Amino acid sequence: DIFGHSFTVFIDPDAPADSRYRATMSIKARHGYYTAHSADGLKWEYDQLVPQWRSNDVITSIYHPGQKRAIVALKVRPYPSVNGIPRRSIGIAELRDGRWSEAHSALLPDELADTDAVSRGYSCGDYYGMGMMPAGSGTVGVLWQFRRSDMMHGVNDVTLVYQAGRGERWEHVPGRPDFISHADPSFGQGTVYTSSCPVMVGDEQWLYFTAYARIHGWYIHKDKEIADKRMQTVIDEGLSRIGVARWPKWRLFGFRSDPKGSLTLKLDGIREPSRLLLNYECEQGGSVRISLEDMPGRTEE
């Protein structure tokens, strides 16, 4: 029924029956990002015949049950200029109460992104795209760090960012270590693109990703013309392979007390009796003590 690049589908449990399935996509020929709806995920209809957002290329979307909204991450075009250089960056939009919002800039490459890229032998660092994961009242982002030698050629590594709540600033994990490096997969060490979100598999969360055998734009000259011999090599070898990153459920982020430390959790907005489940691991001789700050006598060990 419909077509598009960077196609993402999610379920909106609060939508009318005929729009239970939602989709976002890029259509280059129409110079925009589009949205669509479906009752069953099979027969689709565009929400409108003009772009929802005037840009194109990479777009991902998820439904966030804790925030009762869908979140869209999209590559911003035309590229904003940073220090006189056009840069790829991430914009954010949302779907609330059946209405799509305008997109606004959320993640723009900074000096640390460039410093990291230069330290690895590249000229600068862009943000190519981002998958996302609901996490309580917040959101985790898996950010595609495009470390490039020129506008076309480079590699994607994946780092983690997070947003504590709707409308708050996106923060990088301290130190910005690679979560997935393009050099990690033995089956493709060119560049990495993740899916829009992880999925639950038993007691684990799985994030599927595509690993390219060559760097981004390997078969394209700097003048943007296709190099025929390199393109044939890509056809013969295959462009990419699919892999998966796995971790124990809800153990993507953690806190380590070595040998001592404390962590305060602020649980806002609790309107009914709830359980606090601690996902922890103690080494030999270690212990965990839990207390409620507003009830000093309530301590468990």
Language model segments and positions:
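Beta-rich carbohydrate-recognition and catalytic domains
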Residues: 1-125, 133-189, 202, 206-301
